[in-house]
């Protein structure tokens, strides 16, 4: 019994969101008794299949050193600290649109820490910037993060509708990130009358980052699989065809990739699907949530607030069942990825990577950046 509770404690510590989702689903099934048929109807198998396929094909790209290779080549172009900040930040921003925010951070934060050790500069602010860039860049495409993929399917957005909405986040974000970088990399020199000047990088410290691309027949199959995944997202290819193709490709090319899929995220979705559908059968709860989502502004504020407490993916799953205003909810949970450390679980990744090697006040700096940007961007996005 002692081992059981120790195991449970470790599981909760490792997977708190998954534990909460499963617990809520079990409680809902026991108390509300929705029935097996309703539970199966609640699960969006298409979203789960696309999410699974995207996760495994991105792991495949990582196994080929694809992102590392591109990053290493581009970094050789940097001559100043400002250029390095811009390149790293926007690499994360644009790559997160296609490989998700967490993969972008898992790829580029370690590279960033290595580079900044070599050039003997503190990496605190650039890692925070990369985290902001990952969360904001991933907002732009349906496959950029799990909540976008789910909401794109749930509300049946057209591609034009979706990108018109996410552009309201993308355009201000690009400008704000640029302003922050220029401010951070200014260098006040007395002999320049206090004007700002970017630091130059001495020597060839960025030339030593050697990464070899593992280009072979598998790379071509992975690209084909990725294209099929994108076509499935936009309803061109049936999700069962995509799933079958993905399973065959990965089984032939590298079956070990199946072990690297984040199955806890898939189970988290299942838990919240069942919990939300079950609660929709409780009139009192439905009336309460509907009152919180009764107007576009209320939906926007509720989505942001919920994201701060339970993270934006669960917020999207929970609130989507109670509002037809998909546009405002989409904006809310993406803007709501800013703010607290758990507002976007991708933020926890960079926090762990940075604090494993450094012991300065990352949490304070991260929170300060995020709260300020949440307020500024939250107002801008709503008013546009």
Features from the language model and the residues they span:
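Membrane-embedded hairpin module used as a gating/binding unit in multi-pass transport
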Residues: 177-181, 189-190, 194-259
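Hydrophobic transmembrane alpha-helices that form the pore/transport pathway of multi-pass ion
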Residues: 89-90, 94-139, 150, 316-331, ...
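Membrane-interfacial loop-to-helix junctions in multi-pass transporters
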Residues: 45-47, 75-89, 118-126, 217-220, ...
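Hydrophobic mid-bilayer segments of alpha-helices in multi-pass membrane transport proteins
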Residues: 4-6, 10-33, 44-56, 218-229, ...
């Amino acid at each position: 019994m002692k081992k059981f509770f120790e195991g449970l404690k470790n599981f909760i510590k490792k997977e708190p969101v998954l534990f909460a989702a499963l617990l809520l689903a079990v409680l809902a099934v026991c108390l509300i008794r929705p029935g097996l048929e309703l539970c199966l109807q609640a699960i969006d198998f298409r979203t789960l299949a696309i999410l699974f396929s995207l996760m495994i094909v991105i792991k495949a790209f990582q196994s080929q050193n694809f992102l590392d290779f591109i990053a290493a080549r581009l970094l050789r172009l940097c001559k100043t600290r400002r250029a390095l900040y811009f390149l790293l930040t926007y690499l994360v921003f644009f790559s997160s649109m296609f490989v998700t925010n967490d993969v972008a951070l898992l790829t580029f934060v370690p590279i960033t820490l290595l580079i900044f050790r070599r050039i003997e500069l503190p990496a605190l602010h650039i890692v925070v910037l990369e985290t902001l860039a990952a969360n904001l860049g991933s907002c732009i495409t349906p496959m950029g993060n799990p909540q976008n993929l789910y909401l794109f399917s749930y509300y049946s957005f057209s591609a034009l509708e979706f990108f018109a909405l996410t552009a309201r986040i993308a355009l201000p974000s690009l400008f704000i990130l640029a302003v922050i970088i220029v401010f951070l990399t200014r260098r006040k020199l007395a002999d320049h009358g206090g004007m700002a000047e970017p630091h130059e990088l001495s020597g060839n410290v960025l030339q030593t980052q050697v990464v070899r691309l593992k280009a072979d027949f598998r790379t071509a199959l992975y690209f084909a699989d990725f294209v099929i995944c994108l076509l499935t997202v936009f309803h061109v290819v049936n999700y069962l065809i995509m799933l079958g193709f993905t399973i065959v490709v990965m089984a032939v090319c590298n079956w070990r990739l199946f072990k690297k899929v984040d199955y806890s995220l898939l189970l988290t979705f299942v838990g919240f699907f069942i919990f939300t559908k079950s609660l929709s059968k409780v009139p009192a709860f439905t009336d309460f949530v509907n009152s919180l989502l009764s107007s576009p502004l209320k939906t926007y504020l509720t989505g942001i607030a919920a994201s701060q407490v339970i993270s934006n993916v669960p917020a999207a799953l929970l609130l989507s069942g109670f509002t037809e205003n998909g546009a405002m909810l989409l904006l809310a949970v993406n803007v709501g990825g800013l703010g607290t450390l758990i507002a976007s679980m991708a933020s926890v990744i960079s926090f762990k990577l940075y604090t494993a090697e450094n012991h300065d006040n990352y949490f304070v700096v991260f929170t300060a950046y995020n709260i300020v940007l949440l307020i500024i961007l939250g107002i801008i996005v709503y008013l546009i």
